[in-house]
């Protein structure tokens, strides 16, 4: 079953194509990495998929339904690249925000999740009072707490320390492997994609490559964009991770 299907998607800004003729599908249970240079349209693509932006042409389906009629948003967890909505006036504590949208509260899981994101000591603080990195950890905790069927992360670890970053990626991989959660990770870090994702979409305003990471490693796209030395390091890391997993 396709969790996401995108057909011939084009989005323009000021008359210029930001993304053009994008077609791909994400099957249930896949860990997909979307990678590309700055300005390649990665975040724009995600915003079109979620209906935040309206495409100039093309079609998006979520869980088999056209985006225009899709209403099952509890199935989706999304962390945007910029947390501009969170400010000093946001009326909620960390623990309230992290549990937002949950049908059943679970104090034990809440505490464990907050501690894993190293914000357990901030549970009673207003989220708008936190630093950007602390806010980001709180929103990651919210996405993980909800256990949705689809998780979408747009550059989720930019303000995290290396240890918390590793914990986060390991948690998303565990949810993917054990729970069958479909994960989409948008990043500029091809090494992270190689370590955690099964499939890869390389975007530069249009789809340059779509397929498994293994196939990407042997493609001319990989060699052309990253060079043979980086290709060897990244692909060897991917093979080692898969054999150990």
Regions found by a protein language model. Give the residues of each.
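Catalytic Walker B motif of ABC-type/P-loop ATPase nucleotide-binding domains
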Residues: 151-155
């Amino acid at each position: 079953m396709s969790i996401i299907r995108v057909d011939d998607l084009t989005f323009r800004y000021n008359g210029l194509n930001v993304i053009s003729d994008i077609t791909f599908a994400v099957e249930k249970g896949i860990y997909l990495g979307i990678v590309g240079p700055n300005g390649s349209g990665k975040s724009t693509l995600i915003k079109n998929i979620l209906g935040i932006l309206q495409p100039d042409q093309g079609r998006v389906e979520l869980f088999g339904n056209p985006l225009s009629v899709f209403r099952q948003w509890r199935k989706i967890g999304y962390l945007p690249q910029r947390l501009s909505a969170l400010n000093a006036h946001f009326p909620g504590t960390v623990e309230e925000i992290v549990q937002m949208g949950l049908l059943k509260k679970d104090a034990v899981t809440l505490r464990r999740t907050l501690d894993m994101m190293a914000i357990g000591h901030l549970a009673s603080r207003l989220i708008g009072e936190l630093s950007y990195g602390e806010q980001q950890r709180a929103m990651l905790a919210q996405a993980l707490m909800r256990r949705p069927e689809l998780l979408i992360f747009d550059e989720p670890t930019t303000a995290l320390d290396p240890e918390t970053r590793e914990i986060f990626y390991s948690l998303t991989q565990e949810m993917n492997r054990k729970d069958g959660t479909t994960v989409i990770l948008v990043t500029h870090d091809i090494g992270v994609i190689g370590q955690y994702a099964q499939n890869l979409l390389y975007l530069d305003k249009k789809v340059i490559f779509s397929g498994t990471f293994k196939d990407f490693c042997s493609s001319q796209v990989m060699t052309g964009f990253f060079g043979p030395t980086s290709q060897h390091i990244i692909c060897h890391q991917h093979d080692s991770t898969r054999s150990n997993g």
